[in-house]
Amino acid sequence: MPAYFQRPENALKRANEFLEVGKKQPALDVLYDVMKSKKHRTWQKIHEPIMLKYLELCVDLRKSHLAKEGLYQYKNICQQVNIKSLEDVVRAYLKLAEEKTEAAKEESQQMVLDIEDLDNIQTPESVLLSAVSGEDTQDRTDRLLLTPWVKFLWESYRQCLDLLRNNSRVERLYHDIAQQAFKFCLQYTRKAEFRKLCDNLRMHLSQIQRHHNQSTAINLNNPESQSMHLETRLVQLDSAISMELWQEAFKAVEDIHGLFSLSKKPPKPQLMANYYNKVSTVFWKSGNALFHASTLHRLYHLSREMRKNLTQEEMQRMSTRVLLATLSIPITPERTDIARLLDMDGIIVEKQRRLATLLGLQAPPTRIGLINDMVRFSVLQYVVPEVKDLYNWLEVEFNPLKLCERVTKVLNWVREQPEKEPELQQYVPQLQNNTILRLLQQVAQIYQSIEFSRLTSLVPFVDAFQLERAIVDAARHCDLQVRIDHTSRTLSFGSDLNYATREDAPVGPHLQSMPSEQIRNQLTAMSSVLAKALEVIRPAHILQEKEEQHQLAVNAYLKNSRKEHQRILARRQTIEERKERLESLNIQREKEELEQREAELQKVRKAEEERLRQEAKEREKERILQEHEQIKKKTVRERLEQIKKTELGAKAFKDIDIEDLEELDPDFIMAKQVEQLEKEKKELQERLKNQEKKIDYFERAKRLEEIPLIKSAYEEQRVKDMDLWEQQEEERITTMQLEREKALEHKNRMSRMLEDRDLFVMRLKAARQSVYEEKLKQFEERLAEERHSRLEDRKRQRKEERKITYYREKEEEEQRRAEEQMLKEREERERAERAKREEELREYQERVKKLEEVERKKRQRELEIEERERRREEERRLGDDPLSRKDSRWGDRDSEGTWRKGPEADSEWRRGPPEKEWRRETRDDERPHRRDEDRLRRLGGDDEERESSLRPDDDRIPRRGLDDDRGPRRGPDEDRFSRRGTDDDRPSWRNADDDRPPRRIGDDDRGSWRHTDDDRPPRRGLDDERGSWRTADEDRGPRRGMDDDRGPRRGGADDERSSWRNADDDRGPRRGMDDDRGPRRGLDDDRGPWRNAAEDRISRRGADDDRGPWRNMDDDRVPRRGDDARPGPWRPFVKPGGWREKEKAREESWGPPRESRPSEEREWDRDKEKDRDNQDREENDKDLERDRDRERDGDREDRFRRPRDEGGWRRGPAEESSSWRDSSRRDDRDREDRRRDRDDRRDLRDLRDRRDLRDDRDRRGPPLRSEREEASSWRRTDDRKDDRTEERDPPRRVPPPALSRDREREREREGEKEKASWRAEKDRESLRRTKNETDEDGWTTVRR
C-alpha cells in the first residue's frame, strides 16, 4: 500500500491518464491500491466505475489473481449496501473474459484445444512429442493465442463461483455463472475442467449444509433455491451427456436425487419429466436397458397424470417408445458365470437397489414386471399400429417360422422414421437379439435337430457368424439345451436328459416342455392328473353342498349390500375430513416452523453480527501485523527483483529458490551481491591478464592479412557498381523517352477539348456570380452586426476591468499604509528597547567603576591591616617567656584535645580523599552554583549596586580570572547532578587549607560578631530577601567529611537522623542547640569573628546548605594553618594563653610535634569559653541541661585521655576531650584587638569577593566542555599552596608537598571504612534534592 492517501475519484482519473499513454500496469496498480485501502470500506457510487476499469485492466493483462482479490474486496464493500452492483461487476467481468476468448478463437484456426488440463498445460509427454514431431507455425500460434485466454476464462469462472458460494443474496448469479461454466466446458470440450467444476459445485453444496447458521446462508428448504440447484444440476447432467462423460452424469443424477430428498415438497412435474428423460439417456448409455425402460415407464405415467393437454400424437410416441424399450430389455440375465462364481450377488443387488432409489422405486424392476405393468396400464392401446403387434409376436404367440419375418417388418418401419422418431433407432439391435433368442427357444420345443442353413433362412436380418454367436450366448445364459455339430452343420436340442434349468431362466411362449424337464417334472404332472381324476369321480352331494353355500353367500350379499354401500360412503367422507384436518394441521405446523425459523435466524443474525464485530477487531490487529510483515516482504521482494533483473544478480541468486529469498535479510542479499561482484571482477581480471599477451599479436596478424583482400574486394565492388549504374542509367533514359512520347499523344488528343472547356467554365462562373454576390452581401451585414456587438462587449468589459483595477489598487494602498504603520511602530519599539539596553549597559559600567574604586580603597586598607598584624605578631613573639612555655606543655596537650581542630597546615582531614577523574567531574558541576550564592551573601544586603550585578536577568556571560582554577558555572536550566558524585565522600568543597568551621544551621539566632559599639551598617538587613538555596524547612547542618571532628549539626529537637558519633567517641561536650559562637581560630584566620548572642540575623546560608565554609574557592591567599608554629618573617603579636594558641595546639595534635603554647594563652581561652557557655545557658534552659551532660562526658574522657605520641605523625581517632572550660578570661584590651583584627579581615575578604566577581564577569566567557572537563577547582592542596605563595606579597613557608601527599594517602586508606556506612544515604538524599537545568549557553543550575 502506498504511504499517501488517494481519493477514489483521483485514482480513477490517474488510471485514465496512464491508459492514455499506454501504461496499463501502473494504472492497474493505482486502482489496486484504492481497492485494498482500508480508507474505502464504505460503498460509494464511484466504486463501481473504478471496479469496472480495474477488471478491464485485469482482463487485458490476464491478471486473474488480481481480479480475484479485487472482487473479494468489492464484495466486502458492497455486500451490505448494494448487492446489485456486485452482480453487475461480476457479469461485466465474465463478459469481457468471454469476448477476449472468442476473439482469440477467431484468430486461431484451432477450434478445439488438445490440452487435457489447463492447470497443467506443459506435460512431459507433450514436450517430448513436440520435440520429436516438430511444431509448425500455426500450431505454435494457436497455442500462444487461444490457450492462455481459455485458461484465463476458466479461472475467471472458478474464482467467481468461489466468490459467490453460499450467499443467498447472489444465489441467482451463482447458478447463472455455473451454467455458463458448463457451456464453456461443452464449447471447448474441456473434460478435465468439467470434472473439476462438478467437484467444486458438489463441495459448495456440502458447505451449504454445514454452514447453514450463517446470516447469508442458503436455505435448501426454500423452493426457489431448490429449483435453481436442480436446474443447475440438470444443466450439468445434460452437459455430461453431451460430452459423453457418463461417470460424471451418473454423479449428477445422484446429486439431483439428493436434492429431491432434502426437499419436503415434491418437485415440479416439468422438472421431474426433464430429470427422467436425462436419466433414461444415462441408463441407456451405460448399457442398463432394464432401468432405462423403467425410467421411461415413470416418465410415461408422470406425463399421463400431470399433463392435462397431452395430445394423441405425443401419447402414441411415448407409448411406442415405452413398448420398444420394454421389449428391448435383454432376455438373457445380466449376471455372468464369473459373477456367479465370485459370488457377486450381493454387489449386484446393492447396485440395483441404488439405481431403483434414484427412480423412487421400492424394489429393483424386472422385465416381466415391466411387461405386466405395460399390459395392466393399457399402454398397448396407444401404440402406433405398425408396432402394436410386436408385443404379441415376441411375448404371446408361438410361431417360430414366421416370427423373424414379422419382426423384420416392424424393424424396417422403425428404420424408416429417423426424422420423426430418432430416439427409436437405438432399440433395433436389442430387438434383433431378443427375436433370435425367442426363435431358438421355440425351435428347441419343436425340433430335436435342425440344419444350420435352415435356421439361417429363418433369421434373415443376421449372418451366420452373428447367429452362431447368439446361439452360444443363449446356451450359456438362457439355459438353452442346444449342441452344435460342425461336421454335419446341424443343431441338436434336448439331448441331455440330466440337465436341470435354473429358477431364473427366461420365460416366453410355451408349447411343450423339453425332455429333461418332463423327466424332472414327472411327479408334478402325475399329481395334477390325479387331482383332475378326483374331480371327475367326486359324488353329487358334494356338488350340491357347494351350490348351497354359493347361494347363501349371494343372499347375504344382497341383504347387506346397501348397508355396506353406506359404510363405504361414510368411510370416504371420513377420509376426506381427515385429509382436510391433516392439511390444516400441516399449514399450521408450517406456519409455526416458519416463525420458529425466523426467530432462529434473528438470533443467529445477532450472534453473527457480534461475532463479526469481534472478528473485525481481531482482523484489524492481525492486519496491522500483516502490514508490517508485508511491507518488509515487499521491500525485500522489490530489492530482489531489482537485483535479479541485472546480470550480476541473476548469477548471484541462481542457486537460491524464491521462497528462500523471501526469508533472507536485505543485508545478506547485499552481501551476496557484493560477493558475486567481487568474484566476477577477479575472474575478469584473470581473463584479461591471460588474453592481453596474445590479443595484440593476433589482431595485428589479422589486419595484415586483411589488407590485400580488402583492396581486391573493393576493386571488384567498384567495377560491379559502375556496370550497375550504367545499366540503370540506360533504363532511365529509355523510360523517359517512352513517357514523353505518351505525353505528346495525350496533349494532341486533349487540345481539341480546350475551347469547350473554356466555354463551360465561363458559363458556370456567370451562373454562380449572382449567388456569390448575394451571399457576400449577407456576410457583410452579419459582419457589421457582429463587429458592433463585439465592440459594445469590449467596451463594457474594459469598463468593468477599470473599476476592478481601481478598487484593487485602493485596497492595496490601504494595506500598504497599514503595513508601513506597523513597521514604523515596530521600529519605534526596537529603538526604545535598544535605548533601554544602552542605558542599562551604561548604568552597569558605572557600577563597575564604583566597585573598582571601592576595591582600590579596600586593597590599600588591606595592606595596612597586614602590616599591623605583622607588627603585633613580632611584639607577641618578643613577649613570649621560654620558662612559661616550657611549663605549659601539659596544658598544651590538654588544649590539643579540643573538640574542634584548629588550622593545621599539613593536616589532610579538610582536604578529603584523593581526587579521581569521575569525582572531579561531578564536583565541577556543583561548584559554580554555590560560589555564586556565596557571593550574593557576601556582598551585603543594602548595597543595591552589588546586588544588581548578580541578578539572574543579567544576560551577560560571566567571566572569571585567568588564575581561577574552578570549574565552569552552571546555567539556571542545566539539569546535571551535583558535581559531587553519588559516591563522593569528601567532607566539604572548601580548600584543603581552609581551617574555618562551617556555618551554623537555620536556628542560629546568635548576635552579631561585631562589637556592640560598632556603628557600621549590617552586612544584610533583616528583610534581606536573598535567602539560601536551601529550603526553609530543611534543618540539616552543613555536610562534613569523614575526617571532620566537629560536633553534630545543630537542629531542632525533631531531627530524626541518628548521630554519626561512634560509641567510642571521646570528644568534648557538644554545645547547646542555640550556640551561635564560632570555632576557636588562630590569629591568622581571615574570616569574620564569631557572632555574639544578641545577633539574630539569618545564617548567610540556608538551613539546608551542605557545602563547606563560605571561604571563596579561588581565594588566592596563602594557607595560614600552621604558620604560628613555624618560624617566619611575620607573626601577629598576642599575649600568651589566647584562643589562637589553643587552636594551634589543636592542630599540633594532628600533625608533627612542635613546641607547646604558653599556659597563659590556654587560661585565657578557658575564660573565654566559659563566658560563651554562660550566655548559652541564659538563652535556652532546655539545651543547657543537654550541654552539661555532654560536658561531663567530655571531661571524663579528657581525664583518661592518653598523652599524644610526640615521636611522629599520627591520625587522631575519635575526638579527644577539650579543656576549653579550664581556660581563663583575658582582659578587655585583648578582646578589642581581636575584634578589630576580625573586622579588618572581613573587609579584606569582602573586597576580594567583589574583585573575583568582577573578574568573572569581565574575563570569563561561556563555559566550554573542555573547560568543564579539565578546569577543576578541586586542586591538590600542595599545588594551590604553591600558586598562592607566588601571588602573595609576604612570603610564607609551606609544608613539604611530599609529606602532604603521604598523609593524604594514609588518611584515605583509614577513612574508607568509616565513610562507607553513611555515604549511600547521603548520596541518595543528594540525588533526590538535585535537579539540573541547562540553558542555551551551556550554563548549568542545580535546583534543590
From Swiss-Prot:
Composition-biased stretches (Basic and acidic residues): 866-1126, 1138-1240, 1252-1292, 1300-1333
Stretches the record annotates as 21 X 10 AA approximate tandem repeats of [DA]-[DE]-[ED]-R-[PLIGFSV]-[RPS]-[RW]-[RL]-[GNIHT]-[DGLPTAM]: 924-1133
Sequence repeat locations: 924-931, 932-941, 942-951, 953-962, 963-972, 973-982, 983-992, 993-1002, 1003-1012, 1013-1022, 1023-1032, 1033-1042, 1043-1052, 1054-1063, 1064-1073, 1074-1083, 1084-1093, 1094-1103, 1104-1113, 1114-1123, 1124-1133
GO biological process: formation of cytoplasmic translation initiation complex; IRES-dependent viral translational initiation; negative regulation of ERK1 and ERK2 cascade; viral translational termination-reinitiation
Coiled coil feature spans: 82-120
Disulfide bridge map: none
Stored InterPro entries: EIF3A, eIF3a_PCI_TPR-like, PCI_dom
GO cellular-component term (any): eukaryotic translation initiation factor 3 complex, eIF3m
Domain PCI, first and last residues per copy: 315-498
Region named Interaction with EIF3B: 664-835
Compartments in which it is found: Cytoplasm; Cytoplasm, Cytoskeleton, Microtubule organizing center, Centrosome; Nucleus
Post-translational changes noted in the entry: Phosphorylated. Phosphorylation is enhanced upon serum stimulation.
Region entry Disordered, spans: 807-844, 866-1240, 1252-1344
Sequence similarity: Belongs to the eIF-3 subunit A family.
Subunit relationships: Interacts with KRT7. Component of the eukaryotic translation initiation factor 3 (eIF-3) complex, which is composed of 13 subunits: EIF3A, EIF3B, EIF3C, EIF3D, EIF3E, EIF3F, EIF3G, EIF3H, EIF3I, EIF3J, EIF3K, EIF3L and EIF3M. The eIF-3 complex appears to include 3 stable modules: module A is composed of EIF3A, EIF3B, EIF3G and EIF3I; module B is composed of EIF3F, EIF3H, and EIF3M; and module C is composed of EIF3C, EIF3D, EIF3E, EIF3L and EIF3K. EIF3C of module C binds EIF3B of module A and EIF3H of module B, thereby linking the three modules.
Role: RNA-binding component of the eukaryotic translation initiation factor 3 (eIF-3) complex, which is required for several steps in the initiation of protein synthesis. The eIF-3 complex associates with the 40S ribosome and facilitates the recruitment of eIF-1, eIF-1A, eIF-2:GTP:methionyl-tRNAi and eIF-5 to form the 43S pre-initiation complex (43S PIC). The eIF-3 complex stimulates mRNA recruitment to the 43S PIC and scanning of the mRNA for AUG recognition.
Record's protein name: Eukaryotic translation initiation factor 3 subunit A
Gene: Eif3a
